């Protein structure tokens, strides 16, 4: 512990090393699993599941340490402010993470595909595939015999069939949950713990419903639409963006579940509930990303 009692400095920890190891296993496992899609037998998922076990194990121990230290009164206002800034910078890094993906999508739609179709200043590239027509989504790829495009896309079918469009229900779930988490936090600030708990349960329920609908959407894409990772640039960007977003929703739902369990256990007060506030910020973030 630091000799300066005004700012608690934890003892050195090996947890960041284990977290880095878990993330390494995740990258290797996820890449291997994707490469092995379609193979009759593969053990790549074992590596992926191991990475999840390591990551969640480290997070459990790490967060437990932070909670115990806070309950013992080791944290000052200055340190609590450090947590606020830390969460803010973490969300900013996530914004940049998704910004890179949106930038890639924009580049493909505005430049790469038109160039391949004979449009724009670099239209000479269309000599490679003279029959290719630049449209988005790309349903017919330049080399469609080798890399067949999707048979159907995820575009909105029209207002009259909106109720049959899974992304509509996904959006409804996330937007609603963003409101319910705000109501939960407002109830806690007013000391209404029963309402706080109820709104938290509603929020995490909507979050996991979103995850279920996302899985159903992926099943429909693969089984009935021909929309796969190999269905050209449209399939690649679709699963890249929605897949990483879905992962973040899972992470956010688990965080809010932990906050809910802690809330039922008596944690948080009207003035001391940063864990809940941080989870709420993160949840609003994934909501905005989905709408974009």
What function would you assign to each model-found segment?
Residues 1-292:
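...captures the hydrophobic TM-helix bundle architecture rather than a specific catalytic motif
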């Amino acid at each position: 512990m630091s000799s300066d009692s005004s700012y608690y400095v934890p003892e050195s920890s090996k947890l960041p090393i284990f977290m880095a190891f878990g993330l390494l296993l995740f990258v290797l496992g996820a890449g291997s699993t994707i490469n092995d899609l379609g193979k009759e037998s593969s053990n790549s998922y074992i590596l992926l599941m191991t990475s999840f076990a390591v990551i969640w194990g480290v997070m459990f121990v790490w967060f437990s340490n932070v909670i115990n230290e806070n309950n013992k009164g080791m944290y000052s206002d200055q340190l609590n402010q450090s947590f606020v800034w830390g969460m803010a910078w973490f969300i900013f890094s996530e914004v940049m993470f998704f910004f890179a993906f949106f930038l890639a999508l924009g580049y493909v739609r505005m430049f790469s595909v038109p160039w391949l179709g004979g449009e724009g200043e670099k239209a000479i590239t269309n000599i490679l595939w003279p029959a290719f027509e630049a449209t988005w989504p790309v349903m017919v790829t330049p080399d469609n015999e080798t890399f067949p495009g999707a048979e159907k896309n995820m575009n909105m079918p029209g207002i009259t069939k909106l109720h049959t469009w899974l992304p509509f229900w996904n959006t409804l779930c996330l937007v609603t949950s963003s409101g319910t988490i705000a109501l939960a936090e407002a109830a806690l600030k007013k000391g209404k713990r029963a309402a706080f708990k109820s709104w938290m349960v509603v929020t995490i329920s909507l979050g996991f419903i979103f995850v279920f609908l996302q899985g159903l959407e992926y099943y429909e894409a693969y089984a009935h639409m021909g929309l796969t990772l190999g269905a050209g640039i449209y399939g690649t960007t679709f699963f890249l963006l929605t897949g990483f977003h879905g992962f973040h929703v899972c992470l956010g739902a688990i965080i809010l579940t932990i906050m809910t369990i802690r809330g039922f256990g008596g944690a948080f007060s009207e003035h001391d509930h940063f864990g809940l506030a941080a989870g709420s910020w993160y949840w609003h973030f994934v909501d905005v990303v989905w709408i974009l």
